[in-house]
From Swiss-Prot:
Record field: catalytic activity: [glutamine synthetase]-O(4)-(5'-adenylyl)-L-tyrosine + phosphate = [glutamine synthetase]-L-tyrosine + ADP; [glutamine synthetase]-L-tyrosine + ATP = [glutamine synthetase]-O(4)-(5'-adenylyl)-L-tyrosine + diphosphate
InterPro entries hit by this protein: GlnE (IPR023057), GlnE_rpt_dom (IPR005190), NT_sf (IPR043519), PII_UdlTrfase/GS_AdlTrfase (IPR013546)
HAMAP family attached to this UniProt entry: GlnE
Organism: Corynebacterium glutamicum (strain ATCC 13032 / DSM 20300 / JCM 1318 / BCRC 11384 / CCUG 27702 / LMG 3730 / NBRC 12168 / NCIMB 10025 / NRRL B-2784 / 534)
Protein name: Bifunctional glutamine synthetase adenylyltransferase/adenylyl-removing enzyme
GO molecular function: [glutamate-ammonia-ligase] adenylyltransferase activity; [glutamine synthetase]-adenylyl-L-tyrosine phosphorylase activity; ATP binding; magnesium ion binding
GO biological process: regulation of glutamine family amino acid metabolic process
Named cofactor requirement(s): Mg(2+)
Keyword Magnesium attributed: yes
Segment forming the signal sequence: none
UniProt record similarity statement: Belongs to the GlnE family.
Enzyme kind, highest EC tier: transferase
GO cellular component: cytosol
Region listing for Adenylyl transferase, in residue ranges: 533-1045
Length: 1045
């Protein structure tokens, strides 16, 4: 038997390919393999090149540009190509700079391809200031100009024969050729700066070594020096164009402003300049205009809009003319802009005289009355100019962006620089360092902000370099390719846990949150350190410096505010320490309200009232939303503040539950039941009313807080307030009846049933915070009781209830008004149903019938209330409708109201009740239409103005546009009227004139308090449209002048 069959296999050993796959090199192009082979890099000898290429911001773009660069060199000669190939294999620094540059900026790469031999410049160090001046001035064959200025002996030219300084030069190359060579030279120098900068964020790992990091301040200084040299060269060409071979007869100084002035310039940015000359004549003006033209065509946009009077002002002024303008006319923002002013080129001595002369005006600008509001308005205008959908992508102008840091730092400089001259520095980063060193900002906070600011500037630089284009806009979140490029070009690397883009986005979120808490870090925490040391390394502001800072932050009475801080946070108690930790954030929130002073005082009162409540500070510490909502209330509404201070436990309702805000967790009907149930437990009517007041106080605080925090609509507010009044009236009536029955000297059984009929806004469930309760009382004798006895007993009950409710207390008043009853104030307080019917049949006047349109049962005996309403329906909704005589009477009375009821001195345009297009206009229009059509449309048997408007639209009585106009005006005027009570603590109908009081009303109406002018304009626009509809519908005419009675 033969042996088992055996198969023989040839074992081949596995040898790993030493060359990385294109995917491992972060290359995604389908041509990548072929391109690497074309370069001759798909071999072991080229591993350093392959791994080096993989570190580029965008390896595919870098590879594409390398192919083009090699081809451009091949066109020169094979030796030119081989020289570059050999150099990048041997010179690691060159390799890193070249790959970082090509992968970080396709535009600069294009310049290199167009000028292929310039790769050799990447072997050099970044250009020095002197080298930049020499390169640009040599490009136009410049030489020092002759300066001969009459009547100005201080004229001085610091130009040198070696072309290494600013000053007056004259160019031999002019015209289009000058612009061409200047542009080429500028781009070449920019390429060298960018190569070193990009190499600084080229990643280092085990396979490749990165470049030396270049500090942010070094890059921005180099770019600013380049701008100085560029405009010096442009000035040389301008002088040649204007003066030819003649001496320069005017000392012209170019003052750099903005980022260039501060020597913190971007790669691509407008360069802001101002011109000062002695004398400021036609030739100096032509020279300045030529400099702007040449500079803008060759380098970057040169902008002179920061000069006095802006673009409409003279381009060139003398020093005296500048001084006269700034002393008399300049606005706050113009002094803020001067913080960055720096002599750039031309007559440097004259430029320094300009800076020295204006310096005192800069440092006293913070004493101007409008300083704080001006600075806040400037920042708000910047934000408003950013479209909402771009704010998260906007590095410069969005929230948590560069401008937030710059504005805040400049504000601190202007506040404290008046006294502390060390703060008189130009650059943002240098100013932050000084603020830290001098103790105005905590060391850790300051250094974190510097890092955050420099990181955002790094992203800004990378975005601008990519296409040599001015931009501050991040790629869209779903643009993963560009997000990846930006992250890699900025030095982020991927890992197993997250990609480079995710790492960058995560860090960016952290940075923005840090900057958004800027005011707390820069302004409020140092303030608290002046009262109590929050940390061992924090240097305390002196009391005077702290008060200066409080004034700059919008506190009108900084000494009092400082006193409040001291009372709250000083001392060694645990409460004081917690207050010291909380107050920086709380004060930041207060600063966004209409009255920070009042808000801080209210917070101190509330803290005193809550002293024995251990949960108070703990809740503020642990539930940030409570503190934020509380500060908004305390700084905007004295009305709610008083309610909360008298009921501190209410604060617990400012937090959130699992289902949402606790303020909305309680239904108004539950509150009604609670008031009635609580009152029923008290035998004494005084205690019963006291209990009702307490519950009403809490409910008013809940409604008003939810209203101020924009959690309730105007309709929901009015309905909730009406339900509270209904409950109080019902509970009070019940308490009075029980007290009367318990009085041994009075009957022990009720002699009548009593019902309370709501009139006016109470009847329509449209009460405001300051509204009285307009009511009528109706009674019905119980079986076996004479009518006069029942009425007498009912009058005693109702009178007692009204008196008890009206007793003075610390709560908002409870006034019950009977002015709409038959015969007005001289009529009987209580009537039976029959008595009411007889009165209306025999003596009822048109205005009384009109008033019945709002009658609704609100409290007491429900059946009796319904019976009363049914009995008056024939008067208010007559079968054949209102007569023409009644309609004329309504219009006649309305005309008298318009002419006679408006209080003396009131403004008809802004009176929320009796003003043009305001509440009375709208409600009378709706009531007139109800009287005209209710007999045909039963749905109009409704006491609510807004609901009746819906019915009128549904049945096409008036058109939808008219209905919407009246509805919007009613809601706007009602909201304004409610806001007036919230901010003034009492019923007012007249909007304040523009200023702080109107800012409060705007804030309470859900607007930014600083936008009070826009709020007023909106109110006027809405009510003006409403008045037009009233004229058309109520009066039936096109203008007020056509009415006759």
């Amino acid at each position: 038997m033969s042996g088992p069959l055996r198969s023989e296999r040839k074992v081949v050993g596995f040898v790993r390919d030493p060359l990385p796959k294109v995917g491992s090199l972060s290359l995604k192009s389908e041509h990548a393999q072929a391109d690497l082979e074309h370069l001759g890099w798909r071999n072991v000898e080229s591993l350093d090149l392959l791994w080096g290429l993989s570190g580029a911001g965008d390896p595919d773009v870098a590879l594409n540009l390398l192919i083009r660069l090699y081809q451009a060199l091949e066109a020169i000669g094979e030796d030119a190509r081989n020289e570059l190939d050999q150099e990048i294999r041997q010179d690691e620094k060159l390799r890193v700079r070249l790959f970082a540059l090509l992968g970080g900026s396709s535009a600069v790469g294009d310049h290199l391809v167009a000028n292929p031999l310039q790769w050799k410049l990447l072997k050099l160090d970044a250009p020095s200031r002197e080298e930049m001046f020499q390169a640009l001035l040599e490009s136009v064959k410049a030489q020092p100009a002759v300066l001969e200025v009459e009547d100005f002996s201080d004229a001085h030219n610091i130009a040198r024969d070696d072309l290494s300084t600013p000053g007056f030069y004259t160019a031999s190359v002019t015209g289009p050729e000058a612009e061409r060579v200047l542009k080429w030279t500028y781009r070449t120098l920019l390429t060298r700066i960018a190569a070193h900068d990009l190499a600084g964020t080229y990643p280092t790992d085990m396979r490749r070594k990165g470049g030396d990091p270049v500090p942010f301040s070094t890059v921005t200084m180099q770019l600013s020096d380049l701008a100085d040299a560029a405009l010096t060269a442009a000035l040389a060409v301008a002088i040649a164009n204007v003066y030819g071979e003649k001496p320069v007869d005017s000392a012209l100084s170019v003052i750099a402003m903005g980022k260039c002035g501060a020597q913190e310039l971007n790669y691509i940015s407008d360069v802001d300049v101002v011109f000062v000359a002695e004398p400021a004549n036609s030739k100096s003006t032509r020279t300045a205009a030529e400099l702007i033209r040449i500079g803008s065509n060759s380098f970057f946009e040169v902008d002179a809009a920061l000069r006095p009077e802006g673009k409409s002002g003279a381009l060139v002024r003398s020093l005296d003319s500048h001084m006269a303008y700034y002393k008399r006319w300049a606005e706050t923002w113009e002094f803020q802009a001067l913080l960055k002013a720096r002599p750039m080129t031309g007559d440097i001595n004259l430029g320094q005289s300009y800076v020295d002369a204006l310096s005192p005006l800069i440092w006293t600008a913070s004493q101007r009355e409008s300083f704080v509001t001006d600075v806040q308005a400037m920042r708000r205008r910047v934000l408003d100019n950013v479209p909402e959908d771009l704010r998260d992508r906007e590095l410069k102008l969005g929230r948590g962006g560069l401008r937030d840091v710059e504005f805040a730092v400049q504000l601190l400089q202007m506040v404290h620089g008046r006294i502390d001259e060390t703060l008189r520095v130009r650059s943002t980063v240098n100013a932050l360092h000084v603020l830290v060193d001098q103790g105005y900002v905590g060391r850790e906070d300051g250094h974190n902000l510097i890092e955050s600011y420099e990181f955002l500037r790094l992203l800004e630089h990378r975005l601008q370099l990519e296409r040599i284009k001015r931009t501050h806009l991040l790629p869209k979140p779903d643009d993963r390719m560009n997000m990846r490029w930006l992250a890699r070009a900025s030095g982020f690397t991927g890992s197993m846990e997250q990609s480079s883009a995710k790492a960058m986005e995560r860090h960016l979120r952290k940075v923005r949150l840090q900057i958004q808490s800027l005011h707390s870090q820069l302004f409020y925490r140092p303030l608290l350190n002046s009262v109590v040391n929050l940390s061992a390394d924090a240097i305390r502001l002196s009391p005077d410096a702290a008060k200066l800072q409080l004034a700059a932050l919008g506190y009108l009475h900084p000494s009092r505010a400082y006193e409040h801080l001291t009372a709250l946070a000083s001392g060694a108690s645990r409460k004081a320490k917690i207050q010291a930790m909380l107050l920086p954030t709380l004060m930041e929130w207060l600063s966004q309200t209409a009255e920070p002073d009042a808000g801080l005082l209210n917070y101190r009162k509330l803290s005193d009232a809550s002293y024995d409540r251990s949960w108070f500070l703990r809740m503020l510490r642990d539930e940030g939303v409570v503190g934020q909502r509380l500060m908004r209330i305390l700084g905007n509404s004295p009305y709610i503040s008083e309610l909360i201070i008298s009921t501190p436990d209410f604060m617990k309702q400012l937090g959130d539950a699992a289902s949402g805000p606790k303020l909305l967790a309680t239904a108004p009907t539950q509150v009604v039941k609670a008031i009635k149930a609580t009152v029923s437990r008290h035998e004494s009517p005084d205690r019963a009313i006291q209990a009702a007041r307490s519950l009403r106080r809490q409910e008013l605080a809940r409604i008003a807080s939810a209203d101020l925090l924009n959690m309730l609509t105007v309709q929901e507010v009015c309905q909730s307030l009406s339900l509270v009044w209904d409950a109080v009236l019902d509970a009070a009536l019940d308490a009075e009846i029980r007290a009367a029955l318990n009085d041994p000297q009075k009957p022990d059984q009720p002699l009548a049933n009593i019902s309370v009929i709501g009139m006016g806004r109470l009847g329509g469930a449209e009460l405001g915070y300051g509204s009285d309760a307009d009511v009528m009382f109706v009674c019905e004798p119980v079986a076996g009781v004479e009518e006069h006895e029942a009425v007498t007993w009912s009058i005693a009950i109702c009178d007692s209830m009204r008196s008890r409710l009206a007793q003075p207390s610390g709560d908002p008043p409870l006034e019950v008004d009977l002015g709409l009853r038959p015969e007005g104030r001289s009529g009987a307080i209580v009537r039976t149903v029959d008595s009411y019917v007889k009165y209306y049949e025999k003596w009822g006047e048109t205005w009384e019938i009109q008033a019945l349109l709002r009658a609704a049962w609100v409290a007491g005996d429900r059946e009796l209330g319904i019976k009363f309403l049914e009995s008056i329906d024939r008067f208010r909704y007559p079968v054949d409708g209102a007569t023409q005589a009644q309609l004329r009477e309504v219009r006649r009375i309305k005309a008298r109201v318009d002419n006679e009821r408006l209080p003396r001195g009131a403004d008809r345009n802004t009176h929320t009740k009796l003003g043009r297009g305001a509440l009375t206009d709208i409600e009378w229009t709706v009531q007139l239409l109800t009287m005209m059509h209710a007999h045909e449309i039963p749905e109009l048997h409704n006491t609510s103005t807004l609901e009746v408007l819906e019915v009128l639209e549904k049945h096409q009585i008036i058109n939808p546009v008219q209905v919407q106009t009246l509805r919007e005006a009613w809601l706007t005027a009602t909201a304004a009227r409610n806001a007036l009570v919230l901010v003034r603590g009492k019923r007012l109908d007249q909007l304040p004139t523009p200023g702080p009081h109107l800012a409060q009303v705007a804030g309470a109406s859900g607007w930014d308090p600083n936008e009070y002018q826009e709020y007023l304009e909106n109110y006027l626009k809405v009510t003006r449209k409403s008045r037009q509809v009233v004229d058309e519908v109520f009066w039936g005419v096109d203008s007020m002048e056509q009415r006759e009675f």
